[in-house]
């Protein structure tokens, strides 16, 4: 499983994480995928586009998974 470092930031918004990981070409595509229930956070479907993802959470989409670290 890949990891994503928050660096100095306390969180990253879910739609931004999809873009930063290269799983979505644009913010609009990321938001559509989230709204359609294609994204899971810690194993549960997440439909909030701007959901704040913090260290320790795992995000999955289209066969990819990433563990968020501080």
UniProtKB/Swiss-Prot annotation:
GO terms for cellular component: cytosol. Keywords: RNA-binding. InterPro entries: S4_RNA-bd_sf. One of its GO terms (molecular function) is RNA binding. It comes from the Bacteria. Residues 12-68 form the S4 RNA-binding domain. Pfam families: S4_2. GO terms for biological process: translation. Transmembrane segments: none annotated. In pull-down experiments interacts with CedA. Its structure and the presence of conserved basic residues indicates that it probably binds RNA. NCBIfam families: PRK11507.1. This is Putative RNA-binding protein YbcJ.
């Amino acid at each position: 499983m890949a990891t994503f470092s928050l660096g100095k930031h306390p969180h990253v918004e879910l739609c931004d994480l999809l873009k930063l990981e290269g799983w979505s070409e644009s913010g609009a595509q990321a938001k559509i995928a989230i709204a359609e229930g294609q994204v899971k956070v810690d194993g549960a479907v997440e439909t909030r586009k701007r959901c704040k993802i913090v260290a320790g959470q795992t995000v999955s989409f289209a066969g990819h998974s990433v563990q968020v670290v501080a």
